[in-house]
Amino acid sequence: MKQENIKEYLYYYLLETNPTDRYTSFDYCYNYFKNNSSEYLLNNMEKSCLVLGFYLASWGMLRNSFLLQKSIKFYEPIIKYIAELDRSYWSIDVDNYTDDNINKILKVYEDLESKIIPINEKGNPAEAGTLLTKILLGVFGFIPAFDTNFLKAFKFISKYNKGFKVVNLNNLKIISEFYVSNKIVIDEFASITKTYDFSTGNKTNISYTKAKIIDMYGFMVGLKLKKVKS
């Protein structure tokens, strides 16, 4: 699954990641959950809910979604769950998708699904998968977001006709295989791409995860495929 156009797409994506741009909502969400202790998340529950909720809103997850009918209080069980997890979860990335780490990802995915996806929404795995993976990306950074563009891109790249509607062992293995095939360029961009700090608007010393780099590439490829089709 080696790709020759990764740098081109990533440079194009990064043109729209200034401090006030929509894409940078990821930075502020990821920084917040990565940098703050469980105690801080719980003691500042309203802020924690607002950070996660606005990130999801900024990334289109309120559009035509049951979330549009919810207040920020809806996110409280998610914050409590995140606060229960140890800090090792922020060390998981595609370069260490071991069996143990994959099982951790699958467990968090399933736990969050049971907490936040209403019964009447469970019949739409693609919509649920998009929401859950956007939460996992924004909070932990250890998996790409399975949105429409990413699904389109990786169905095309992997030739896997069943697509990426949900997080499962097979899909994580495909992402891992993609990483291994393109390791040099993904590692390069992960090392040089830093998050923005909300307070100063300057770059931090926190690098984008490799999963986030893959997310960016998949998003841009899917966007182009959509334009070509139309």
Which residue ranges define each predicted feature?
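An N-terminal alpha-helical hairpin/helix-loop-helix interaction module that forms a charged
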Residues: M1-G123, G141-S230
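Short hydrophobic alpha-helical segments that form membrane-spanning helices or hydrophobic packing faces
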Residues: L131-G138
